[in-house]
């Protein structure tokens, strides 16, 4: 979805000689030749907005919407808004179901994504184990693509509801749930890391990151955390 949206943007960028009204707009970039627009790509960009607007789920969801609307539509957007709100709320709330309901409060109640999350809360009451939960999910969404936002974020919700708030367990549940495992495990790991800040995870990891971003050849998790905290403080100051 992101690649196609960027291609769409470049195709209509005003640096080219184009007719009046030909500009690159979100309505065009997210839709034109983009069948991936309700997949999980926007949701996995949500983390930073939750960190930057820590403790303010409404603002986190707003940032997420602004980000997602260029590349995704409908449930692809709502998934990012939901995740950003949950991450933001996790700095102030630890109860999994309350976090999920906070996330739901930031998206349209009648969208398919919200319906799926509410269904997940119901399945938790009916299914004693995560395996039984997954049986219900697989049956309900057996014809949905394995990279769609709806079914994958239900796995994140499952890991949050059935996990024990440790990164190892919650990430393992997300991976065992299948589908887009690198995305779901990263999202639940992000949420769980906030809920369990004393996990000492950094002690077991190499702090060096070598990203593929232009201008960022080598960085560290510590440096990224410090930069993120600086953004949060700036946003908090501006919001006063």
Q: What positions do the PLM features span?
A:
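Structured, active/binding-site neighborhoods that engage oxygen-rich ligands
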Residues: 1-240
């Amino acid at each position: 979805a992101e690649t196609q949206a960027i291609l769409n943007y470049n195709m209509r960028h005003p640096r080219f000689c184009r007719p009046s009204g030909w500009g690159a707009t979100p309505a065009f970039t997210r839709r034109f030749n983009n069948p991936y627009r309700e997949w999980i790509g926007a949701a996995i960009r949500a983390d930073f907005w939750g960190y930057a607007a820590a403790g303010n789920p409404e603002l986190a969801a707003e940032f997420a919407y602004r980000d997602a609307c260029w590349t995704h539509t409908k449930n692809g957007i709502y998934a990012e808004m939901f995740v950003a709100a949950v991450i933001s709320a996790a700095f102030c709330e630890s109860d999994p179901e309350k976090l999920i309901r906070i996330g739901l409060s930031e998206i349209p109640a009648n969208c398919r994504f919200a319906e799926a999350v509410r269904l997940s809360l119901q399945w938790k009451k009916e299914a004693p184990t995560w395996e039984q939960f997954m049986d219900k999910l697989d049956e309900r969404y057996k014809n949905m693509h394995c990279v769609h936002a709806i079914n994958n974020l239900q796995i994140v919700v499952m890991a949050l509801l059935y996990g024990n708030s440790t990164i190892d367990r919650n990430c393992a549940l997300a991976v065992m749930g299948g589908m887009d495992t690198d995305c779901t495990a990263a999202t639940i790991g992000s949420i769980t890391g906030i809920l369990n800040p004393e996990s000492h995870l950094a002690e077991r990891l190499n702090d060096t990151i070598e990203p593929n971003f232009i201008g960022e050849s080598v960085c560290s998790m510590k440096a990224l955390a410090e930069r993120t905290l600086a953004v949060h403080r700036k946003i908090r100051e501006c919001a006063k």
